[in-house]
Every structure is written in C-alpha cells, then in structure tokens.
Amino acid sequence: MPVFSFAQKKIVADMLKKKCDDLHCPLFIEKRDFAVDVLEKTPSGQRFLYVNHKTGERMELFTPELNIVQTRNIGLVLFILETLFSIPLEKMRKEIKKIYIPGRFEIISKKPLRVFDPCHTPESFKNFLKSFSVIEKPSKSVLCIFLLKDKKIKTIFSMAKDAGFKKIYWIDLPVLRKKDPSSFFCKDLILSSENFSKLWKNYKGSLACVGSFYLAPLITLKRF
C-alpha cells in the first residue's frame, strides 16, 4: 500500500521512510500545493474552500468533521486523488460528506455529550476550543485533562479557565506522569483513573477529554 505525505521537516520524513521501509510500503513525499480555508462552522460540520494550486481548481465543499486538522487531512486526500489519480473533484463532492476520520475531536456520544480530542499543545487546544464551542458552551461542560507534558499543563489549564469551563480536572495516571500533579493542580481537582471512569459513565452533563493520543483507544472504545 503506498503512503503519501506532505512532511516538510527532515526528521519527520526520515521517520516515515524508516517505517515504510520496515513495512515494505512505497513512500511519496509531495509538495503541498493546496489550501483549505474554513468558511463556516456549524454543529453539523464545516463548509470549506478547497484550492488546488497545481491545477488552479477551487470548490466549496462540506464535511461533518469539526476539527481544522481533519479538514486539512481531507484536503490532502482530495489533492492526492485529483492530482495523482486524475479523479475529478466534482465526483468527490458527495463522498466528502461521508468521510469520517477518527482521532481528532471525536464525538463519542451526543446524549450525554462526550467529546475526545488528543490535543496536547496550546495551538491544538485552541483548535479544540473553537470546535467545542460550536456544539456546546464551555460554561455548561466539565473538562478532563490528562497526560500533558509538564511545561504545557499550566498554559492549557489557564486557557481552559479563560474559556469558562464549569469544572476542570487533571486525570492522574501515575505510570505515565513525570511529576506529582499536586505541584500545579489543587488536590480537589485531581481525579484518579477510577474516579474518572465513574465521572465519564455517570455524569449527566457535557464532558470533554483532552491530552494524549495514547489514551485514544481507551476513550473512544470505552475501555476503562
């Protein structure tokens, strides 16, 4: 199976090459000659403008995805299919509405609302806030943060407080933490994994979890 990437950093390209060599997959690193601009974001998805700089073609499209990262990934798919496989953009319009890409801003359930986003940097957390505020008010929601690097915890916690979340918890997983979280979180804001599980299952209001790709299978498949 061929692998396509727009990796510009040498360290990323080298890592991909090694992995593809191990799996015997051909790797194609392409120049990013496309742009994606979000025109409108609603609870049902995003209307965006896709521009192929290589062909000059541009088209307004809709995706049920709410995270800008996933919309850019859809732009990558469009560019590859249109440029490398000569599939007309118009033929892909309807199919785009069906594309679901797991891993970013996943709505696990709507009633009660459960959202998971493995954002772990201030920039990605900012994107999470933009998406989340479209479907729910932070003031009505509980936010759970876990597995963030120490230097980023205070920044993201501050951003979460400014966003006005009803309650913000740090989920304490000792096996993966680097230091005692009580050094930067009040003890009553720290939850054990067991108490987090109870909160996730029993809380009737809206709840969002952010912090790490490592726990994606646990959250999205409810394995906790």
Would you name each region that the model predicts?
Residues 1-60, 74, 78-90:
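Acidic, Mg2+-coordinating active-site environments of NTP-dependent enzymes
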Residues 3-28, 113-115, 154-208:
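C-terminal helical cap/extension that packs against the catalytic core
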Residues 14-16, 39, 125-126, 153-155, ...:
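Short glycine-/acidic-enriched loop or helix-start segments at secondary-structure transitions
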Residues 32-34, 120, 145-149, 170-177:
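Short, acidic/turn-prone active-site loops that include or flank metal/cofactor-
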Residues 53, 57-165:
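Nucleotide phosphate-binding/pyrophosphate-handling subdomain across enzymes
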Residues 214-215:
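Alpha-helix capping/helix-boundary segments
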